[in-house]
Structure formats: structure tokens, C-alpha cells
């Protein structure tokens, strides 16, 4: 019998809710906010629409390259470290946008921003969810990924108000701080790297009675080499 069917809510669903929350902030303050940042920059004499558009392309290019390393890293280590590092990098790059004065500076900052976004968004998020679910993985991933859209719906209008009321130079560091607060605390308070880290099984399944060793099997185990337990597939999102 699985934990999902009992009276206790399977902790994996709390993981889904936490991932939805973090994706709301990481996507809302990066992916959906490019128009806000670039409009503010293009309004200054040092930049124009063409240079700002190239910066967005560099964001996705650098994020794609970084994603190759991020995907490999999160398979072997706790994804919460990746989310934390990515949030710090993204927040720093976002804050730095208010200080750029030349086109090369803009391109460098946007490349760094893209790498931070890659490390704090979909790749580590879906990896964690996939570790907690097998039978309902598609449902869990679809719910968690809703945060990508919520970021644009909720945070983008708020960021527009910040820029209008405070100016971009003042609002950018504030948005960077919001990025940190929206990702890091939730990652360490509610996220866990795997069910095994909490003494649970994937999907909340209970331990089979057949897997509990008896006296006879215990004696047999002493006379033969031990074998490693099978590792549950789910480290990568397919």
C-alpha cells in the first residue's frame, strides 16, 4: 500500500508545490522579464533595440550550454546546491544590469544571467520531481511546471510597477533580492533530494513484507557476499 492512499500525504506532493513556487520566481524574474529589462536599457543612449535583442539571444545560448553541465551535475549531487548557486548567480547578474554602461558589459552580464537561470530553474527542478515519482511522474511534472507560467502572470506585472515607480536602476537590485528569497529558502526548507533521504520509497510505496529479512535469510546472508540494492530510475527527466 502506498503512502498516497493512506491518511498521510506523500511528501512528494510537497516537493511538487515547492518546485512550483521556485519556478514561479526563477521564470518570472528572468524568462518573462526580458522585455522589461531591455526596454529600460534601450531607452539609454548606450544601447539600442538591436544590441538588447542580441543580449537575449546570448542569455538562451549560454543557458543552453550551461544546461549540459547542470544536467550532469544534478544527477550525482544534491540539486538544492545547484538551485542555490544558480539563484545567487542570477540575482547578482540581475542586480548588475543596473550598472552596465557598454554593450560588451551587457553581453557578459546576460551570459552570466543565462547560466544562473539554467542552474536555478527547470533542469534541477524536474530532476528532483522525477526522483520522487514514477507512476504519477507526468502529472507531478505538469503541476510543478505550472510555476513557469505563473511567473509571467504574477511577477512580471509587479516588476513593471517597480520599474515605473522606482526606476530601473533602483528596481533591478530589488528584483535580484526577490529572486534569492523566492528560490533559496524554499529549496532548503521543503525540498529533499530523494525519497531515500527521508527513509521513504518512490511514490510513497511501503516496504514489501517479502523484503524484510527473516532469521533464515539473515543466516544465508552471512554466508554469501552482499549485493548492492537496485537503484530506482528517475534521476533524469525523460
Question: Regions from the language model: what does each represent?
Answer:
Residues 1-22, 225-238:
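Cytosolic juxtamembrane N-terminal segment immediately preceding the first transmembrane helix
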Residues 14-49, 67-70, 156:
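Extracytoplasmic
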Residues 24, 93, 104-120:
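Hydrophobic core of transmembrane alpha-helices in multi-pass small-molecule transporters
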Residues 41, 119-133:
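Intracellular juxtamembrane helix-capping segments at the cytosolic ends
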Residues 59-64, 149-151:
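Short hydrophobic/small-residue motifs within alpha-helical transmembrane segments
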Residues 65-104:
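Conserved MFS/SLC helix-loop-helix module at the cytosolic interface between two early adjacent transmembrane helices
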Residues 143-144, 148-198:
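Helix-loop-helix hairpin linking two adjacent transmembrane segments in secondary transporters
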Residues 192-233:
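Flexible cytoplasmic inter-helical loops of multi-pass small-molecule transporters
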Amino acid at each position: 500500500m502506498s503512502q498516497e492512499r493512506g491518511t498521510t500525504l506523500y511528501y512528494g506532493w510537497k516537493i511538487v508545490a515547492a518546485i512550483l513556487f521556485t519556478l514561479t520566481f526563477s521564470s518570472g524574474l528572468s524568462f518573462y522579464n526580458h522585455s522589461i529589462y531591455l526596454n529600460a536599457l534601450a531607452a539609454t543612449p548606450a544601447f539600442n533595440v538591436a544590441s538588447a535583442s542580441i543580449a537575449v539571444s546570448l542569455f538562451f545560448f549560454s543557458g543552453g550550454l550551461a544546461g549540459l553541465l547542470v544536467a550532469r551535475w544534478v544527477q550525482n549531487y544534491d540539486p538544492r546546491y545547484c538551485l542555490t548557486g544558480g539563484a545567487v548567480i542570477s540575482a547578482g547578474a540581475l542586480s548588475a544590469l543596473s550598472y552596465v554602461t557598454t554593450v560588451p558589459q551587457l553581453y557578459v552580464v546576460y551570459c552570466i544571467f543565462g547560466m544562473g537561470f539554467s542552474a536555478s530553474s527547470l533542469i534541477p527542478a524536474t530532476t528532483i520531481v522525477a526522483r520522487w515519482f514514477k507512476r504519477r511522474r507526468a502529472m507531478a511534472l505538469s503541476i510543478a511546471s505550472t510555476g513557469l507560467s505563473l511567473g509571467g502572470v504574477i511577477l512580471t506585472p509587479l516588476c513593471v510597477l517597480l520599474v515605473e515607480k522606482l526606476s530601473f536602476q533602483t528596481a533591478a537590485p530589488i528584483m535580484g533580492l526577490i529572486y534569492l528569497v523566492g528560490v533559496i529558502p524554499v529549496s532548503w526548507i521543503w525540498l529533499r533530494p530523494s525519497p531515500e533521504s527521508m527513509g521513504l520509497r518512490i511514490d510513497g510505496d511501503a516496504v514489501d513484507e517479502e523484503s524484510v529479512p527473516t532469521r533464515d535469510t539473515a543466516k544465508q546472508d552471512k554466508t554469501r557476499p552482499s549485493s548492492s540494492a537496485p537503484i530506482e530510475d528517475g534521476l533524469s527527466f525523460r
